[in-house]
């Protein structure tokens, strides 16, 4: 009688391979999500820096900061609409979130955002409240504010 040789994988080999693939994909997925969150946080920080620069230019011309900011609108000189400080005030990359602008006096302001990366070194702990709009864990302040 001739011995019959079979080819293929046993059930245990298939289960082990599937388990290893599941572990690897979980690790890669969490790294992917972490990288996306860090990218959004980087954009938030850059957005706030851009807004601060525009607000400082506004203050240099008007000697006060604007009362409010409307996200998505432009920041223009109230006396001369052709003088544009910022063509579009950026908003948070997530549609259900918003930045917060708090002008505590004519010559000071704070801009707030919520960072997603819990390990970010710029993250405030504990978070700070802003204008009754919730708590934020990242802030930039006017240049004349400590």
Regions found by a protein language model. Give the residues of each.
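Aliphatic-rich helix starts adjacent to a transmembrane/signal segment
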Residues: 29-49
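Short, surface-exposed interaction loops/tails
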Residues: 106-146
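Detector for intrinsically disordered, low-structure N-terminal pre-sequences
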Residues: 1-2, 75, 138
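A generic fold-level signal
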Residues: 6, 43, 103-106
